[in-house]
Regions:
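Mobile active-site "lid"/loop adjacent to the S-adenosyl-L-methionine
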Residues: 257, 298, 309-374, 382, ...
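C-terminal catalytic and target-recognition region of SAM-dependent MTase-like enzymes
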Residues: 319-322, 326, 385-465
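Conserved nucleotide-binding/hydrolysis micro-motifs of P-loop NTPases
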Residues: 269-270, 301-302, 338-340, 392-394, ...
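Beta-strand cores of modular interaction/reader domains in eukaryotic scaffold and signaling proteins
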Residues: 72-74, 241, 263, 294, ...
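Glycine-rich nucleotide cofactor-binding entry segment
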Residues: 4-7, 11, 15-256, 265-285, ...
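Helix N-cap motif at beta-to-alpha junctions
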Residues: 77-81, 345-346, 465
């Protein structure tokens, strides 16, 4: 009887349900398993950029994951210039223009006399490509379209393969455009940019106000000055910064004291407010610039200088009222919204890799191409458009440039020339690593442990007809 009872007890025990209580959302084990938006961004970059950049991706990745990146200081021309320069130099900072001129002179004075021009040109190309000597051959834009993520992305209406969207831009990959060499990078007289040498991670002191009541210098990522320099600003230029927030590049342009007209535009009120804040903090005697500086809130895809800017600015620019009936912009900076590759690895806030922004991220190249296309359509003959992103994505970089050039060629009779700036940038290779990962149109400064700034892609396009 006892044996029977024991068997029954065992059967009843076997039927008992064991209830397991999960840990709360804030428990360390749950948090550890939870994938953040930053994790998703890194996973995407590993899958995508690993294929595009080959073995070089590992070192780029290491630099990107370091939270503190390297800045340069743009001296405020509206403050006490000589004092500021002296103070920055006392901290060990060097003037970027001086560095460029020293290395440019060294290159000019030490050509190889014993070798043919062909050999020297080959060596120059090898130096530019030295960064990727260990990378996979022929990776880059041509191999980009083979990238297919392992997972599908749920859109609002249907399932979308990320590669299907990117594949749309394959159409412009083989589009040919005239190419012209640029041999010199021009530094405007009043644009003073200071940096620390390679492997020096010193931080600039906090900027203080000078005798004119504005801050002494503006800190920005060291690679962000390159698109501004590529504009090749000249006295009297009319300049448009299409996507200007937070305002660092607009401010850098103003520091040259060259623009006769400066228009800083962005699409949202909050972003426009950031531009205005920077201008108020750094531009003294704003009244003197009231008739030359304008901050606008417009969608860059639909800016029409013959219409919108004539209406917005003719009340300020009486002298130019008639000129605004035709195209007037001689320089346009197109620093488009992008995946902001460094930022998304260090901030959860409003991260473009969060699920709610999937469709926005997939549509980025389409948006970028539309903005660049519009810029190319409104630039004046002889004018320069500089397109830039802080992304490593060949789709957002060369891919977008190719699509925009193709569209302009199809829809207008304009003639565009893409500037090959390899020679002009060569003296800056002491500070920047310019990777040539199959790029056809532009240039890219990639992050390194020695100088951890960037990434920054930029492409200079000039309209000749």
């Amino acid at each position: 009887m006892a044996r029977l009872f024991n068997r029954q007890a065992i059967k009843d025990l076997a039927k008992m349900q064991v209830v397991r209580y999960g840990n709360k959302a804030d428990h360390w084990s749950v948090i550890k398993k939870k994938k953040t938006h930053m994790d998703k961004a890194l996973k995407h970059f590993d899958e995508f950029y690993g294929d595009v950049y080959g073995k070089s991706w590992e070192s780029i990745r290491t630099a990107l994951l370091i939270k503190e990146h390297k800045y340069m200081a743009v001296v405020n021309s509206f403050s006490d210039i000589d004092r500021i320069k002296s103070e920055l130099e006392s901290h060990g900072a060097m003037n970027l223009k001086a560095i460029y001129e020293i290395y440019k002179k060294h290159i000019d004075e030490n050509p190889s006399k014993s070798k043919s021009n062909k050999t020297k040109n080959k060596q120059a190309k090898n130096r530019i490509k030295s960064l990727i000597s260990d990378a996979e051959p022929n990776v880059g834009l041509s191999g980009l379209y083979e990238f297919v993520p392992a997972t599908k992305i749920k859109g609002m209406e249907d399932w979308i393969l990320e590669s299907q969207h990117y594949g749309y831009y394959k159409e412009g990959a083989n589009f040919s455009v005239n190419n012209e060499k640029e041999v010199l990078l021009t530094f405007p007289q009043y644009l003073n940019i200071y940096t620390f040498e390679e492997n020096n991670d010193s931080r600039f002191p906090s900027s203080k106000k000078g005798s004119t009541g504005v801050l002494d210098y503006y800190l920005l990522d060291g690679a962000s000055v390159l698109p501004v320099l590529a504009l090749d600003l000249q006295p009297g230029d009319a300049v448009l910064d299409m996507c200007a927030a937070p305002g660092g590049k607009t401010l850098s342009i103003l520091q040259t004291l060259m623009p006769n007209i400066m228009v800083a535009n962005d699409i949202q009120k909050s972003r426009v407010n950031r531009i205005n804040k920077v201008i108020n903090q750094y531009v003294a005697g704003i009244g003197q610039w009231e008739d030359r500086l304008c901050v606008t809130e417009r969608d860059a895809r639909f800016i029409d200088d013959k219409d919108m800017y004539n209406k917005v600015m003719h009340r300020k620019f009486d002298f130019f009222r008639e000129i605004f009936i035709i195209t007037i912009f001689l320089q346009i900076l197109v620093d488009v919204p992008c995946t902001t590759d460094r930022h998304v690895l260090h901030s959860e806030e409003n991260n473009i890799f969060k699920p709610q922004r999937i469709r926005e991220r997939l549509k980025l190249p389409e948006l970028q191409a539309a903005i660049l296309t519009n810029a190319l359509k409104i630039i004046s003959v002889g004018g320069t458009v500089v397109y830039s992103t802080c992304s490593l994505s060949p789709i957002q970089n060369d891919g977008v440039v190719g699509m925009a050039l193709k569209k302009v060629w199809e829809e207008t009779n304009f003639i565009m020339i893409v500037k090959d700036m390899s020679e002009a940038l060569s003296p800056l290779k002491c500070l920047y690593k310019f990777g040539n990962f199959g790029l056809k149109y532009g240039h890219i400064a990639i992050p390194t442990l020695q100088n951890n700034w960037g990434p920054m892609y930029f492409c200079k396009i000039v309209r000749t007809r």
